[in-house]
Amino acid sequence: MEVREIRKQLEEKLNRPEWTLSYDHKEAKLRIEDKELKKGMTIALKPLLAKVERLGDRAISEMVHYVQTGMAAFKKQTTIKGNEKRIFPVIRATSFPEENRDGHRLLFDEHTAETRVYYSLDLGDSYTLLHEQQLSREEMSAKEIREMALFNLRSLSEPLKADKVAGNTFYFLNSNDGYDASRILNESLLEKMSQKVEGQLAVAAPHQDVLIFADIVNERGYDVLAQVTMQFYAQGRIPITALPFLYENGELEPTFILAQRKPKE
């Protein structure tokens, strides 16, 4: 399949009278915009092509659903007050925009050299990222939002599926609630996993919908973790980072030293 074929399929599936579709040939990007609101979403077709080659029609179906729910979210009037239990943190790459398309500065905190923490209001099938103007309008502080988000995060379940490779145990958290990677901010979960492992604890958040814990007991474990993390990163609809982290003394350490580190005895 080629980019032009993906473009054709998307244009057919996303053709609505209330939307305008425009295509940037140079960048190979399809823009979907609401005619009334003048807001919309842009799809980069080259990365989508790579996913189609791996996942087939499923990749296109997922993208169509993502656009439909995202466009519907633009229509909803969102307020923070009264929806405090729907505020959650989301992990994004440091390359993620600091402002939304309206030019409002998003509320975010630095997390690691690879990641940032943004804050979202859950709308059910979609979400909206909070920005500083919203907080000012509703007379709320960033500290209040952070506390609400982390409190709500701790209320989420933590279903883990284990897989063992060459003596190393890998735990996958994949509940598909939109906040799997966000659970890396749950310090009690990290500490619990730290106590559970026999070797070195490593953590990876390759994309929004998965969090990986690894109990590394030999050098083979590092190689497997790197491969698995890269695979998930390439498949993710919202990729975050292909680099795992070591967890020691309550801190997530950079992974460029991962291959040089030995598991604890």
Curated annotation (Swiss-Prot):
It comes from the Bacteria. Pfam families: DUF1444. InterPro entries: DUF1444. NCBIfam families: PRK13668.1 (NF010189). Belongs to the UPF0354 family. This is UPF0354 protein BH3252. It comes from Halalkalibacterium halodurans (strain ATCC BAA-125 / DSM 18197 / FERM 7344 / JCM 9153 / C-125) (Bacillus halodurans).
